[in-house]
């Protein structure tokens, strides 16, 4: 049994948590493609994307699907997860979030092809899917 009083346990801490720090410091990291010259697809699903509507401030939820054909670099998955988590408190539209993710992804790994699909959870009886593409 803990000696902590309920008041102590429920007090919000001003200390930055390690996960928050990793998200804030996160950037897309890449490593060398182990099979340069071989054309293959990498499919990534990120089911916990969140951001905030720039008009209402309400949270938006989406599953982000990234499919790409690597050239010389491959994206490291933990770094990608932290990058995606950095959108949590950003006020950004569905359209801009999908485009920004693609722009940053292409800048990081310069793939031969990339596709980002943002499938947003319906809100107010509206279901939005934004799909953007890049071809080298």
UniProtKB/Swiss-Prot annotation:
Q: Which UniProt keywords apply?
A: Cytoplasm, NADP, Oxidoreductase, Queuosine biosynthesis
Gene Ontology, cellular component aspect: cytoplasm
Disulfides per UniProt: none
The pathway where this protein functions is: tRNA modification; tRNA-queuosine biosynthesis
State which Enzyme Commission number(s) the record gives.
Answer: 1.7.1.13
Organism domain of life: Bacteria
Name the predominant localization: cytoplasm
Classification via InterPro entries: GTP-CH-I_C/QueF, NADPH_dep_7-cyano-7-deazaG_red, QueF, QueF_type1
One Gene Ontology MF term: preQ1 synthase activity
Cleavable signal peptide: none
Name the enzyme's class. oxidoreductase
Indicate where this protein resides in the cell: Cytoplasm
Q: Which reaction does it catalyse?
A: 7-aminomethyl-7-carbaguanine + 2 NADP(+) = 7-cyano-7-deazaguanine + 2 NADPH + 3 H(+)
The residues that the entry says bind substrate are 75-77, 94-95
**Family in the record:** Belongs to the GTP cyclohydrolase I family. QueF type 1 subfamily.
Please give the function described in this protein's UniProt entry: Catalyzes the NADPH-dependent reduction of 7-cyano-7-deazaguanine (preQ0) to 7-aminomethyl-7-deazaguanine (preQ1).
Report the PANTHER family cross-referenced here: NADPH-DEPENDENT 7-CYANO-7-DEAZAGUANINE REDUCTASE
Please state what the protein is called. NADPH-dependent 7-cyano-7-deazaguanine reductase
């Amino acid at each position: 049994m803990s000696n902590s009083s309920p008041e102590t346990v429920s007090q919000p801490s001003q200390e930055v948590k390690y996960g928050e720090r990793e998200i804030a410091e996160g950037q897309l990291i890449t490593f060398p493609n182990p099979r340069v010259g071989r054309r293959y697809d990498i499919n990534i699903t990120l089911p916990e994307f969140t951001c905030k509507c720039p008009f209402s401030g309400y949270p938006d939820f989406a599953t982000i699907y990234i499919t790409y054909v690597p050239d010389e670099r491959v994206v490291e998955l933990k770094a990608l997860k932290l990058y995606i988590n950095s959108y949590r408190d950003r006020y950004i539209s569905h359209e801009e979030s999908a485009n920004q993710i693609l722009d940053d992804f292409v800048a990081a790994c310069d793939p031969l092809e990339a596709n980002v699909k943002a499938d947003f959870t319906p809100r107010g009886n509206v279901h939005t899917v934004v799909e953007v593409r890049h071809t080298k």
